[in-house]
UniProtKB/Swiss-Prot annotation:
Pfam families recorded: Ribosomal_S5, Ribosomal_S5_C
UniProt family annotation: Belongs to the universal ribosomal protein uS5 family.
Superkingdom to which the source organism belongs: Bacteria
This protein's name: Small ribosomal subunit protein uS5
Organism of provenance: Methylorubrum extorquens (strain PA1) (Methylobacterium extorquens)
Function: With S4 and S12 plays an important role in translational accuracy. Located at the back of the 30S subunit body where it stabilizes the conformation of the head with respect to the body.
Residue segments, region Disordered: 162-192
Lineage, opening ranks: Bacteria, Pseudomonadati, Pseudomonadota, Alphaproteobacteria, Hyphomicrobiales
Residues in S5 DRBM domain copies: 20-83
Domain notes: The N-terminal domain interacts with the head of the 30S subunit; the C-terminal domain interacts with the body and contacts protein S4. The interaction surface between S4 and S5 is involved in control of translational fidelity.
GO cellular component: small ribosomal subunit
Amino acid sequence: MAREREGRRRDDREERDSEFVDKLVHINRVAKVVKGGRRFGFAALVVVGDQKGRVGFGHGKAREVPEAIRKATEAAKRGLIRVSLREGRTLHHDVNGRHGAGKVILRAAPQGTGIIAGGPMRAVFETLGMQDVVAKSLGSSNPYNLVRATFDALKNEDSPRSVAARRGLKVSALQARRRDADPADTSEAAVA
């Protein structure tokens, strides 16, 4: 009976792992100086997501590459964050993020735009499940800083529901204001 339970637990863990997509962002050879010389190892940066709005990143170090990747993947799964997506495909509004000397600007994009982002940011958006976004990185191009800056920006994003709750309004009132301020609607009003 204990074996049955143990087997079921393992199956659940494998099922949970299969829902995640992981991307290796960066691998680096590192050296530890010891009495007899240098001891080489590897450091891996991995981004993990379920392509439904949850994403995390992790850093792992080990003597062998596969072990470093495994450690980084486990760390990424422990640090997942949830990001609210508009229509399940893009951001609700433009956001900025920063970590160290790495700065990123993320902009919501119309349907069909695709992921316009470079390197480490693209991996974050693909594992997150975002389909339309325009991103620009400024400053440092260090993958660690860019991934952390991207996560900082994603954490700064507010959904209309959270903004409405903070202001004591209904979501429909916020979205009505958004439609009133839309430049496409004002041009039609000027023609009429």
